[in-house]
Amino acid sequence: MTYQKLNVNTYSNLQIFNMPDLIEIQRASFRWFLEYGLIEELDSYSPITDYTGKLELHFIAKNYKLKQPKYSVEESKRRDSSYAVQMYVPTRLINKETGEIKEQEVFIGDLPLMTDRGTFIINGAERVIVNQIVRSPGVYYKSETDKSGRRTYNASLIPNRGAWLKFETDKNDLVWVRIDKTRKLSAQVLLKALGLGDSEIFDSLRHPDYFQKTIEKEGQYGEEEALLELYRKLRPGEPPTIAGGEQLLHSRFFDQKRYDLGQVGRYKLNNKLRLNLPNTVRVLTKEDILASIDYLINLEYDIGQTDDIDHLGNRRVRSVGELLQNQIRVGLNRLERIIRERMTVSESETLTPTSLVNPKPLVAAIKEFFGSSQLSQFMDQTNPLAELTHKRRISALGPGGLTRERAGFAVRDIHPSHYGRICPIETPEGPNAGLIGSLANHAKVNSYGFIETPYYPVENGRVLRDRTPIYMTADAEDDLRVAPGDIMTDAEGKILGDVVPVRYRQDFTTTNPQQVDYVAVSPVQVVSVATSLIPFLEHDDANRALMGSNMQRQAVPLLNPDRPLVGTGLEPQAARDSGMVVVTRTDGEVSYVDSTKISVIDKEGNQADYPLCKYQRSNQDTCLNQRPLVFEGDQVVAGQVLADGSSTEGAELALGQNVLVAYMPWEGYNYEDAILISERLVYDDVYTSIHIEKFEIEARQTKLGPEEITREIPNVGEDGLRNLDEQGIIRVGAWVQSGDILVGKVTPKGESDQPPEEKLLRAIFGEKARDVRDNSLRVPNGEKGRIVDVRVFTREKGDELPPGANMVVRVYVAQKRKIQVGDKVAGRHGNKGIISRILPIEDMPYLPDGTPIDVVLNPLGVPSRMNVGQIFECLLGWAGEILSVRFKCVPFDEMHGPEKSRETVHLMLKLARDNSGKDWVFDEKHPGKIWVFDGRTGERFDRPVTVGIAYMLKLVHLVDDKIHARSTGPYSLVTQQPLGGKAQQGGQRFGEMEVWALEAFGAAYTLQELLTVKSDDMQGRNEALNAIVKGKAIPRPGTPESFKVLMRELQSLCLDIAAHKVETVDDGTTQDVEVDLMADLPGKRTPSRPIYESLSTEGNQD
């Protein structure tokens, strides 16, 4: 079946509000960092004075410079270096005594630059900085019930950095304060210590009589007494002083270096407490403290409201720029200490700014952030969608955030304020559920870090779609009635119907159209990019939609991408914003095209070259490849797509293939979600993907001399070297299989490495046998493929190598993987399964016109999982296949009328039947079902079957990467049991429960073998191997090593444990004898080597 689809029929009369650039969040944040964040940080540390105050070092931050990066993006990837710029800051050193001023530009460190795709290249690997969602600084009020059942309130003042301040009331109507979670002291003490008199305190409170109780209970404090009391509480055990108290209070809350509310904190405080302090006041003031106590007391009188900490108005997003700024602060902190020390130690005449400023602490801080922070992640590059989603991810984990163990249900749960901001569907399954989310489609992050979402205004029940949408934060929309994007309107935008569902004050209710204030701009505004690529999403259960969203990110790019027959209309934007397709920057004419570059000449006659990426390896070992879409002489406009990337076709995202599916059981081969497929999918390379793996070896300098990359490898015949060049490196284009040598390497070997026979030869003849050992890079078990690239890096060529390495060789092996039994495939609706059998085409069920089915799915996978969207997709795809059209259906289509999905699908199927003249395509009696014939017998099945075209993806969980076997292999040092896992060439663990199963069956000998000779009886297993090689009977097992370890552990606890056996003596009496369980322990710790004697000599002796 060939699918030549040309005309696209978009069924949806919705003019979607254009989606913003999807990775704007990354770019805008980094731009902010370069323009403001870095300058702000440097300014906050300038000037740095020494302890005497004689010397001052000023950073003139606004004039900082970035030098050109050393290598381009491509070159950085090739050389395993970072794509970074050097930062230079003009500095001024002022000597107060002599009045001398020295100015210099000082290097302060390397700053990794963001590529235009929103990623960073660190040591040759693309990384993404994930956005973090944290509690916003500000003041939070909470009500609690104490032991006596009385409601009390507390207020927490949380800064960006610095000490927390917590006020609380108790059952006796007293007001207390805690500083940084220490012991509580009376609020009066804090206020008096700030130098406030009774009159000032009472004037600023709405209910001064409430606070009067606190003063009466505690008695009056003067300012000095209060300071002493404060010092006693915060520093118990030290003699209190008034100066000490003042200094303590000032440094905790009023010192800019130690306490910072941040712009956000100030904004939130002003909003909540109705203050008018300027944005520049980033420390606490007396007004803040008084106002927060006032609000707290008002709560006791039911004035004001408590805060919900999971509300998105109280959580903010920290993107790259801010996370990097925080890290630079850490570096500058260390730098400041170093500068102070140097100022004190050195002679002031000889000092220059360059000698003072050491870039190391800043470089280390930046390196640590990009290299090992929890939020700096290896980019998921499986396909363009995975890449895009990774950059829009929002995590509550990481430094300053939550931890998995401590996060409860409330934090993970969907909150009404998530609407249009964070996707309620896309989140991982497992321990991170709800802690990691994805930004919704139209969401933006504002300058304070709060997520905003756009709405159209509504006047008198009419939606003003011609106006610019208004972006709103979560707290701005709390008191408004907001309707969803899929309500029915007429051509003028008037809302139809009498009842409209709205969100109002964190609640989902209904109202009449006149009361509606705003309407969402699009039905897919609620969900993320991946979720909005699922057609008929509204017919799927949320759990399955979640799996569908997550599995689209795991789809492997296929050899011949095929865009879906049934899509949602967001595919082009997802492809374009992922950065995988090549987009023109100017209008013009294509002057040159080949597979590696496209040139465009603009109106002014300037030529722009667009290089294409050919068969590059991605982070996940999939293949990145671009193919031109334009021809020489074509006219192009700015923003037009010139070339497709991997998993895109015709500038649209194409993650899978359109295949003919039938929902029917077939001989039990699709039991429990297994999937039966036709051989056509193998022969026609429908699901064939290319995977490129990288193998690396370095030649190091050892104590005994340098390692050598060479062809001269001991004990390897010419056959093993046939594909190596004269240097001993494999040639490009060679086909290799497991065990083949990729790079020959020999390592010098010391005296101790020599076997006894070699020592003997040397003793007799005094000659040196060639003392090197083979340490070559070989193809690992179960791998095969073709060499596509070889890169050699040496010191001589000026490459940067790891310390101790003289030469690094990198070999890239490409494999073509056809689909096979054991591979995982899935649809977009969370319907996943493993391929259980590949049937010959002639055995597959076929349609009345003889077309064989491609994939047979189990119908029982639908009802209990409630992902009915797959049925709609499958039938609409069937209509599209016959009519040769594609459909774009935006999810949530009931705004076009009730039951719209079903109506449309039926309409299109009827149209397909009438246009094709094949009556069997749509049967009114069983709509959507077709009589299907058994390919083996030619008989018709006993009932009609749902058949259609579904879009199925092949996922990255390939059986080739998982299959594994072990005969002999490495053992763990302590327990002497085989290691686990494919990477360690490990065994299959026969665990506690499996042992119970064998015990239940009484399979004693099998069990004994499993626990001894197949596992950790060291002597027994060597003897058993020997016996197997020689064809003898397997000897009796000994004591397992792990049992001996247990005995030793018990003995180390001073428990004398011994085993006794009862023996009968000659005179018929019995006595017990102690058995030494350690007896069979050989003298050496290492197991004796099995002795391989040839079987023939054995036979001759008999």
UniProtKB/Swiss-Prot annotation:
Residue segments, region Disordered: 1081-1102
PROSITE patterns membership: RNA_POL_BETA (PS01166)
Database matches in InterPro entries: DNA-dir_RNA_pol_bsu_ext_1_sf, DNA-dir_RNA_pol_bsu_external_1, DNA-dir_RNA_pol_su2, DNA-dir_RNAP_su2_dom, DNA-dir_RNAP_su2_hyb_sf, RNA_pol_bsu_bac, RNA_pol_bsu_CS, RNA_pol_bsu_protrusion
GO cellular component, one term: DNA-directed RNA polymerase complex
Statement: the UniProt record of this protein carries the keyword Transferase: yes
Assigned keywords, A-Z: DNA-directed RNA polymerase, Nucleotidyltransferase, Transcription, Transferase
One of the GO BP terms on file: DNA-templated transcription
Catalytic activities: RNA(n) + a ribonucleoside 5'-triphosphate = RNA(n+1) + diphosphate
Gene Ontology molecular function: DNA binding; DNA-directed RNA polymerase activity; ribonucleoside binding
One family name in Pfam for this protein: RNA_pol_Rpb2_7
EC number(s) from the headed UniProt entry: 2.7.7.6
Primary enzyme class: transferase
Subunit structure: In cyanobacteria the RNAP catalytic core is composed of 2 alpha, 1 beta, 1 beta', 1 gamma and 1 omega subunit. When a sigma factor is associated with the core the holoenzyme is formed, which can initiate transcription.
Family: Belongs to the RNA polymerase beta chain family.
Function: DNA-dependent RNA polymerase catalyzes the transcription of DNA into RNA using the four ribonucleoside triphosphates as substrates.
PANTHER family recorded: DNA-DIRECTED RNA POLYMERASE I SUBUNIT 2
Protein name as annotated: DNA-directed RNA polymerase subunit beta
Gene encoding the protein: rpoB
